[in-house]
């Protein structure tokens, strides 16, 4: 887990390299003199202390938490578009191809407090964990039973009939 204040070119290039290395980046973009930004920045800085206390496993190893002033946006090569307003909190992963704003996330609590930020970060890390598994949806039991293995349609049904279907002989019944 890394916390970065993007105030010089070295730190900005370090963040660009972190995105290229497929790290999960949580970025706060603020503007000097902005009232909501002034209120949000101290809450964002508390994330460091809270997450350092929670690092009991490998959950946060691939995480970078950064903050930058709006003037540095042109130097950030991975940003697709400029923020709609300030402050703007972004989640960036998959080498910059996945970008989501805090306001567009599925978290219930969207207030700019430490609790809502931690909830957002944890929800993104859980979602990332489950994305690597099965692709596509599960077949329902009704659909599986409707497949005619004497005349399967398509590659998936053929493979299901060949490898996945349990015949009545192989099924176990629980009493």
Identify the meaning behind each predicted range.
Residues 78-84:
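A short glycine-leucine-enriched loop at secondary-structure breakpoints
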Residues 131-175:
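Arg/Lys-rich, intrinsically disordered low-complexity tails that mediate electrostatic binding
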Residues 84-132:
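Non-catalytic, surface beta->alpha helical segment in thiol-disulfide oxidoreductase systems
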Residues 3-10, 29, 41, 48, ...:
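Thiol-based oxidoreductase modules, predominantly thioredoxin-like and allied folds used
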Residues 35-36, 73-75, 97-99:
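Eukaryotic short linear interaction motifs
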Residues 13-53:
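Local sequence-structure signature of Cys/Sec-based thiol-disulfide redox active-site neighborhoods
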Residues 25-30, 64-67, 88-93:
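Beta-strand cores of modular interaction/reader domains in eukaryotic scaffold and signaling proteins
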